[in-house]
Amino acid sequence: MGAGALAICQSKAAVRLKEDMKKIVAVPLNEQKDFTYQKLFGVSLQELERQGLTENGIPAVVWNIVEYLTQHGLTQEGLFRVNGNVKVVEQLRLKFESGVPVELGKDGDVCSAASLLKLFLRELPDSLITSALQPRFIQLFQDGRNDVQESSLRDLIKELPDTHYCLLKYLCQFLTKVAKHHVQNRMNVHNLATVFGPNCFHVPPGLEGMKEQDLCNKIMAKILENYNTLFEVEYTENDHLRCENLARLIIVKEVYYKNSLPILLTRGLERDMPKPPPKTKIPKSRSEGSIQAHRVLQPELSDGIPQLSLRLSYRKACLEDMNSAEGAISAKLVPSSQEDERPLSPFYLSAHVPQVSNVSATGELLERTIRSAVEQHLFDVNNSGGQSSEDSESGTLSASSATSARQRRRQSKEQDEVRHGRDKGLINKENTPSGFNHLDDCILNTQEVEKVHKNTFGCAGERSKPKRQKSSTKLSELHDNQDGLVNMESLNSTRSHERTGPDDFEWMSDERKGNEKDGGHTQHFESPTMKIQEHPSLSDTKQQRNQDAGDQEESFVSEVPQSDLTALCDEKNWEEPIPAFSSWQRENSDSDEAHLSPQAGRLIRQLLDEDSDPMLSPRFYAYGQSRQYLDDTEVPPSPPNSHSFMRRRSSSLGSYDDEQEDLTPAQLTRRIQSLKKKIRKFEDRFEEEKKYRPSHSDKAANPEVLKWTNDLAKFRRQLKESKLKISEEDLTPRMRQRSNTLPKSFGSQLEKEDEKKQELVDKAIKPSVEATLESIQRKLQEKRAESSRPEDIKDMTKDQIANEKVALQKALLYYESIHGRPVTKNERQVMKPLYDRYRLVKQILSRANTIPIIGSPSSKRRSPLLQPIIEGETASFFKEIKEEEEGSEDDSNVKPDFMVTLKTDFSARCFLDQFEDDADGFISPMDDKIPSKCSQDTGLSNLHAASIPELLEHLQEMREEKKRIRKKLRDFEDNFFRQNGRNVQKEDRTPMAEEYSEYKHIKAKLRLLEVLISKRDTDSKSM
């Protein structure tokens, strides 16, 4: 050992490093997860695709959010309008970017996930509708007709970059699902366009931006309304061949022989697999693909299954080796307690199944090693076909990008009318395979199947182009090295049908019809639980295909060859396919019963619900007009749609307008307050920009504010009507009280009829308001006659007025016990005289108990007579005193000995005369801080030291000044009334603010002078 090596061994740092390495090696692989931060928000879509952070061309974060919202949020009321918690949204964002596995159901909620989706779109460096094309979108909607708009809009959408196009299509597809549930979530197309318009179009701030945003929202609504036309119009004549080939494709679910080779598809396994290096993009025009008519789509390896051609001589040996290999490794790889980790069939195209539990990294490594060894041993795999081992592993990734059959079945109803009409006539009999002459002609090429799925799925457009160029070389290798294979023919794939959405492939596996052919070439065996179906558009030509089967066999070419199921085993050993999940494997289950997927929990709960009828099959919406599907009792997952217990439309799922009528007063009040707040914000914003308050015409010019104003008036009217109904309802106790939050349809129809009958009976018994008033007045007249009380209040004494008050009070209580307080305008007008008389009597009694000190005219103001306040009418509390009508006689007779104390004897007539003089009230000037002339009077500070003659002289001067100012103010208010047709309000007094303030100070000084004179008079008498 050299000196250097000895020094390293003796170094403590080296020993410590060695110990640390031992610890790292000793830690299991599944505990060594290091989540690295990777920015997802605020990154361009092209960059996300380059980094491999997309699924089928859609950003992974968007994919996860939309999948979660599709399952849990479609019926959430106020979806996308109700914002999520800011902290929760930020935590979800950090988790996504740090690489931590995110479960939106546990870590967040529906509102937070919706807010996170809007945040992702909002933070894109270039908006979803790119800034380069946005002016053209806006210009298109500013001029042009409807038909021109639609065709031009379709062309503009095609000009979007691939990543933007795919995301826009995926987003619009999801939003159309949300709009279909607008009865529950209150989000129709226009509401969704209002929410997502600002997120898909980035407009500049300011007034111009607001106008531009309104147009962008209309564009978004147009895109959502015409989603099928704008995005699926690419299904043109160039796609006919592809449609027919895909329609004839046989997709086989899991077909397990008693034992099978386990192939685990978990998301954890997909993450650990090496990704193929990025490939350079070869520019190519969108129409170039249609010229290359004879190029074969060669797929990459899928699910670790190599490209192979099964020969008859290898079939039995393969099955025996697979049975023996499974016995050694199935116990390690597939736990019996986890049914979700069951192996998947190589023919099962959709690996987008719900996420299952991840096996440890060590188990994954072991599984991959064993699988590759078994494949090489069983299938004699070589990599000379242009696929490396990394490509083989990356095929698992491609399998995960497909949608599950269950999801395709659930989404099929969205493609009903468009696809049903479009697929008519897409028939090419030459491409219809009827069978195979020899077993050697049957190729089970899973890579071809998966590649067709991936190209039809189409959103990962850039990465699929170089693979298509490579496929021509592989085709030549197939012809050179493998004899007896079925010829291949490619699709005339244009750029337009590379970019088809995830829903364009839905009908491949779940919308087929079982066929039975007795031709001499091949027999297709089918069981009651597995039917291999054709596309419905091909059923009309089934007999013609049988007749031309001989010609087709010679010239038959297909993009994806059919698998002859007889090539897998002998006819005598043919068995039923074993379902992929153990929960489906029930020995006692009827073979004719449709199997439900593990995700059918919500369907089962709804079917087993006590008050609910069985739900319709999802296929009913897509093919509701086709009798061949209505009468097919074998169609999973539900019974036939023509059965008598078809679910009827519940009244609780009525239109939004019907539910509007059922709003409670509290809900109406909340909506009114919300609308008033929105209008107030608009007014404030308008005032900041224009420097003046918006008029009614300004509000009407804005469509949104005009809608708010109309809704506000409508809700106010409904609130008034609901209050009227409540006031007219009988207050008798009811047998059953229902919550206001439940729709009225939950109540029994019989109960509603009983309530209506009871209301009619009550209305028939209850007298009218006029009849009640007449009876009350008749009783009051009788009581007055019994007690010899005069009818005129002026002629009554104090005791008689007190008795009159009690009688009026009892009469009004009797009226309110029958009809309640007067609410409507008619009731108020009828009952106004009686209420006014009662109010006047009360005021006289309260006034009589307050004896003023001095008989000065100012004593009238110490307890002014308040006028009746009528509901719904504008009350004016600021009217002038008619003191000048007394003339100058009262003022000229003012002498030092004018003090006259009021007699203790009560006279109702003198009080009423005084009330008539005070009927117009008094002016209450605006509380302004403008300095008054009187405040600068130097004699004001010396009033306390002045003599009585000086005080009286000053009092006379102040009265003259008060009359002068009052006359000036009266002229101003009369002119204002003639010009505007209403009384002067406080905010209208600005031009005369100084006069009002001066008038206020003069009144205060007059009160002070009267108090001083009264005080001096009492002092002189006491002396």
Curated annotation (Swiss-Prot):
Entry-annotated residues carrying Phosphoserine: 345, 597, 617, 727
> Where, by tissue, is this protein expressed?
Isoform 1 is widely expressed, with highest expression in skeletal muscle, thymus, brain and lung. Isoform 3 is less abundant than isoform 1 and predominantly expressed in kidney, pancreas, liver, lung and thymus.
Entry GO MF terms: GTPase activator activity
Which keywords does this Swiss-Prot/TrEMBL entry list? Coiled coil, GTPase activation, Phosphoprotein
Enumerate the Gene Ontology biological process terms: regulation of small GTPase mediated signal transduction; signal transduction
Which Gene3D superfamilies does the record associate with it? Rho GTPase activation protein
List, alphabetically, the SMART domains matched.
RhoGAP
- Which intervals of the chain form a coiled coil? 666-730, 946-978
Record region (Disordered): 269-290, 381-437, 459-562, 628-663, 726-759
Site residues (Arginine finger), renumbered to this chain: 81
Spans of biased composition, class Low complexity?
A: 384-405
- Using the record's annotation, list all stretches that form the Rho-GAP domain: 43-231
Q: Name one GO cellular component term.
A: cytosol
Q: Which domain of life is it from?
A: Eukaryota
Q: Which residues carry this modification: Phosphothreonine?
A: 732
Polar residues: compositionally biased ranges = 536-549, 738-748
Q: Known SUPFAM superfamilies for this protein?
A: GTPase activation domain, GAP
Compositional bias (Basic and acidic residues): 412-427, 509-524, 750-759
As for family, the record states: Belongs to the FAM13 family.
Q: What is this protein called?
A: Protein FAM13A
Question: What organism does the UniProt record list as the source?
Answer: Homo sapiens (Human)
Gene behind the chain: FAM13A
